[in-house]
Amino acid sequence: MEGSVTPQPAGGPFTIDITCFDGQGNWSSIQLQDILFGDVWLCSGQSNMAMAVSQALNGTAELAASVNYPNVRVLSVKAEVSYTPYYDLNSTASLYHPWAKPDPDSLGVNAVENYTYFSAVCWFYGRDLYDTYKVPMGMISTNWGSTPIQPWSSPDVFNSCVENATKADVTKSRCASETEKEFEYKPYFKNDTVLWNAMIHPFVNMTIKGAIWYQGESNTFLGTDTYSCFFQAMISDWRQKWYAGSSQQTNPLFPFGFVQISTSWVPQFGVINNYPVIRWHQTNDVGYVPNAGMPNVFMAVALDLSDPESPYGAIHPRYKQDVAARLVQAARVVAYQEKGVIYQGPFPTKFNVDSQEETIDVQYNNKGSGPIRLVGPLNNTFEVCCSNYTECQENDTWIDTTVTALTGLYSIRMNYTCEDLDAVAIRYLWSDYPCTFKNCPVYNQDGFLPAPPFWLPLDYSVSIGNSAVKFGGFKFLICFCHVFLFACFYFPLGRY
């Protein structure tokens, strides 16, 4: 059963009586109790999003405190695969827990396995949004560890990013029926599109405020080169599918937040070189969001939240509260249109090179970050490419530089030595584990937001503003009543 009601002010709880006529002279009714009107956010990704509240720092205390947020509601989805799209979750067996008020039970205190029940990042994000706006929040946690981006992408994404997209998995996802599947192999959780079908598609007819995403580690060794295309195309595709599936009630440019991946190693294990590459690809090879190719997208930089002592492995840092806080800071501008909020880490806008003195001045002046502050070690974090060419070549040498001074509110100076070569490019934090906990070199003035990594030519110049933050003017309430799902949330005018 599916229906909609007229817009209502955010709030609750309410009781809603629904009466239905089946067209054959039969009437039935259902009463929905304890209903809230507010914002729905979908949270997805791999194990760092799946990491449960109990696994986060101070998890036991966080679980106990969750009962203080009855106006945040949570839905926990089990891991499931399918070659064909689901239009609803198959049964209550598809859920760790149906829609519920947060408490230790609904957030997974009794979970037998880690990375199940409710996402820590999702919970802290929804909780902090509620603390900020006092608007009810509905949070959906649908994740699977060790997954690349491809299983979360529909066939249309592959059509955008894979030349002559005729992969067997994609063809099967698009064309095969469940009857045909009875005689074939069962889908594997890393097969193309199978998680889109089973764990995302069931929600596209539910109106949402936005989505947050924490994924990318698995693509450091699988499909690294195509990640930029896949991520951008997946965001666009999800937006199109939700806009159509919710009868044009969801913003066609709904806010999409992501976590730029953290670290994966401790020193004795070496470096996974593709971590900085994936971080770069997550921004569409621009370095910051929102940007022209990723409008209404925001991010939390996490490479300075390393946790080598994590009992879950260094690839799974426990500092999920910090991740969520940074996401919320960016969402305040991109999703909720606040003005005057510092929501981006410092990003270069221009480089001034003095080849005689061998100094480089890095200018930071992006409107979203404000003045800068130097915090951590000032050597071995900025590198310069020395070359005989005007562009850095694959075999050219990268040399470490040393930051020597903060030369103004928005600029720093560093020394370099290229001998008889020219300095043509510069990169920052271009390694798996570039700094210890909250101890990278450059932050915004209050030390809350780190500068993201970059790889840029030294003739780079850009003006960074909020031009890629786009807002809609929708005003609606949408209320879906499924056999196994219920969510009813209100989106007032201008909340995009």
Task: Outline where the language-model segments fall.
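Cell-envelope and extracellular/periplasmic
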Residues: 1-464
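Poly-acidic low-complexity segments
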Residues: 299-301, 472-478, 492
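C-terminal GPI-anchoring signal of eukaryotic secretory precursors
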Residues: 461-479
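Cysteine-centered motifs
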Residues: 479-481, 488
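C-terminal membrane-anchoring or membrane-association module
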Residues: 488-496
